[in-house]
A protein has these predicted regions:
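A cross-kingdom feature that marks ATP-driven nucleic-acid transaction machinery
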Residues: 1-103
Length: 103
């Protein structure tokens, strides 16, 4: 399953930076909530390909986590898509894994 393997690749990349990696689940879900030295570093959703069938689910999970952790930005890591979604005062950036992993 490409989705599971892809999520594991993102986890391994995050793990190189910190051990404080968590999962968020309330009404919706966020794949990775990352802290570094006790401070939130990022909110990440992993999606092989964003489309009409999963867009709402992926964004809703991030918006809920952004509200919970009071974060203005979050990321969706994709296989090869780039986009920016501005929802109110929140910004979600979708970017390909190969670009994101260079950071």
């Amino acid at each position: 399953d490409n989705g599971r393997l892809f999520e594991n690749m993102v986890f391994l990349q995050l793990r190189r930076q910190t051990t404080e990696i968590y999962y968020f689940s309330e009404k919706n879900e966020c794949d990775f909530v990352v802290f570094q030295q006790g401070k939130i570093k990022g909110l990440y959703q992993v999606c092989w390909q964003l489309d009409q069938n999963n867009m709402n689910r992926e964004i809703s999970g991030l918006i809920e986590a952004m509200d919970y952790f009071n974060q203005p930005t979050a990321s969706i890591i994709t296989q090869n898509q780039s986009d920016t979604f501005v929802i109110g005062e929140k910004t979600i950036t979708a970017q390909p894994f190969h670009e994101w992993s260079k950071c």
